[in-house]
Amino acid sequence: MDDARSDPIVVALGGNTLLGQQGPWTADEQREVVDRTAERLASTFDAETDLVLTHGNGPQVGNLLVQQEAAEETPQLSLDVLVAETQAQIGYLLQQALDNERPQAAVMTLVTQVIVDPDDPAFDRATKPVGPFYTEA
């Protein structure tokens, strides 16, 4: 019998996908969507499959930005910290949901950092929105 494991399967989940329908989103709604996602992943891949999940977090970061702007007395955090917070939040919810679906599986959350060139000309023409879209000013 061959004990060699196959390469891991990478699944990318969009930040909007993890929230469901148009917001505002509650914590319970986010958990329900993540729980359904974990159910689908557990039913799609067998317990021996090494699975790597990656996810977006644009709308989640936007929600935190809106919360910070609404809290006039609280000092605002920088965007990089908000990104890390939402990575950890989503990772926590996914890890908990996957642990519930497959208690025998080893699941972990990893918060990442990206190094960018502050002089990159792409900063002059941003194309990736963060947060909600508004229909009027």
Show which residues each predicted segment covers.
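Short glycine-enriched loops at secondary-structure junctions
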Residues: 57-60, 113-115
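Ligand-binding beta-strand-loop-alpha-helix segment within the catalytic cores
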Residues: 70-137
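Flexible, active-site-adjacent loop/turn segments at secondary-structure boundaries
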Residues: 16-17, 59, 79-80
